[in-house]
Each structure stands twice: as structure tokens, then as C-alpha cells.
Amino acid sequence: MSASGEVSTARDYIGHHLNNLQLDLRTFELVDPNSGGSATFWTLNIDSLFFSVVLGILFLYVFRKVAVNATSGVPGKLQTAIELIMGFVDNSVRDMYHGKSKVIAPLALTVFVWVLLMNVMDLLPIDFLPYIGEHFFGLPALRVVPTADVSVTLSMAIGVFVLILYYSIKMKGIGGFTKELTLQPFNHPLFIPINLILEGVSLLSKPVSLGLRLFGNMYAGELIFILIAGLLPWWSQWLLSLPWAIFHILIITLQAFIFMVLTIVYLSMASEEH
């Protein structure tokens, strides 16, 4: 094979694995990834939606089953692991959230475990599920890491943003929240436009940074796995993929933890009365 042919094959391989399984909501037809068309507002990444929902259901099922069958005696391995996770999350909430709410701890647990499960999908062999999807179901493309899709991470961040607004208005009232936006940092009516711009940018930057941070790290990790699989011979891929997978375990756990911590911190800031 010529050098240009090898480059073309590697380019096609990498491009194929970066394509989502998309549904055009205007025609309700699957989008052909080879058509050269770009994604629009009316395009839905159904693979990201499918895997995120399935992993969310898996999380609820496993935790509910363990809670129902929990015993006060010697716990099993799964119950022990879940108790450790719940204790870790509960301690994190106690350290960072200083208000009183029965929602924050369950929310933090859901965010941490759900994001972690979606991140773990990046450890699967890069061709495993796409091969099954293509040869058994005729799917033109399939991406299995929901958090490597910016629409998923920003959707979760927008959910957190809605909670930030809710707790800000709940704790401070509409008047207090309005004063916070218009009379800080300069407490003078003449500076209301400047204050509004500064506080508005600060407020909007929270969901944007929250979503893009998770997306950027997971997209980069996924891309490295794809590059290893697409550019190296099969017999040498494990020399890089195995060490990277071991290191990536730390990354996916850390990113889930950071997303949870920032969620707690933002809600704690919103709940503080001034």
C-alpha cells in the first residue's frame, strides 16, 4: 500500500470513529456520516442519548437493588463498594455545602456515579461496540462515550445552572438575587450596567466551564485511543494503549469527581445568603 493510501485509510478510520449516530429530526432519518453534511440544530446524537440513558438506568437499578437487599451483617463486595462511594460523596457534601438541603447529597451521588459510568465507556476496546453496531444492526456510525459529546456535557451543566438559579432565588428572593446581579461589585446605581455585565458573565461561565471541561478531557482521551488504534500496527497497539488505559482510569475518576465538586460548590455559593 502506498504512503498516501495508508494516510487516507488512517484518516478515514479516525474520522469514522469521531462520527455520531445522528437522527435528523426534520425527516426522522439517520444521517449518513459520509454525506459530508454538517450537524444542525435539528440533529440528535442518538448514540450519546442511548448510552447515557442506559447507564443512568443501570445506576438506579444497581443502587436500588443494593439498598433493598442491604443487610446489617457482613456486607457483600457490591454493598461494601456502594457504601464506600456513598460515604465518600456524603463527606464531600458535608465539607463543601454549608446549607441545609435533602437534595444536594443525592444529586451529588447521581452526578458522580453517572458521569463516572459514562466515562468508563472510554475503556472499552475502540472497535468493539461500533463493530457490533455496524455488522449486526447496520448502523453507519457509533460513539459509545457520552461525555465525549459536548451536547451531553453541556446539557448536564445546564441542569446544574437551572438549580443554581433556583437556589439563588429561593435563598435570597427575587429582589436579593436582582441586587446581587446589579449592585456587585460596585455598590452604586451608576454602575448597574457594568455590574450586570460582570455578574452575568460570571454566572454564565459556570455551566459553560463545567460542561466544556468534562467534554474536553474525555474527547482528548477518546481521540488518543483512536489515534493509537488507527496509526499503529495491531501487534504494537498494546504497548501504548495499555499504559494509557491504566492512566486513563485516574482521569475518568478525577473528571467525575471534579464535576461533582464544582456542582456542590456552585450550589453552595448560590445558597449563601448575603
Swiss-Prot record:
The chain crosses the membrane at residues 43-63, 103-123, 144-164, 223-243, 245-265. Keywords: ATP synthesis, Cell inner membrane, Cell membrane, CF(0), Hydrogen ion transport, Ion transport, Membrane, Transmembrane, Transmembrane helix, Transport. GO terms for molecular function: proton-transporting ATP synthase activity, rotational mechanism. It comes from the Bacteria. It is found in: Cell inner membrane. GO terms for cellular component: plasma membrane; proton-transporting ATP synthase complex. One of its GO terms (biological process) is proton motive force-driven plasma membrane ATP synthesis. F-type ATPases have 2 components, CF(1) - the catalytic core - and CF(0) - the membrane proton channel. CF(1) has five subunits: alpha(3), beta(3), gamma(1), delta(1), epsilon(1). CF(0) has three main subunits: a(1), b(2) and c(9-12). The alpha and beta chains form an alternating ring which encloses part of the gamma chain. CF(1) is attached to CF(0) by a central stalk formed by the gamma and epsilon chains, while a peripheral stalk is formed by the delta and b chains. Key component of the proton channel; it plays a direct role in the translocation of protons across the membrane. Belongs to the ATPase A chain family. This is ATP synthase subunit a. It comes from Photorhabdus laumondii subsp. laumondii (strain DSM 15139 / CIP 105565 / TT01).
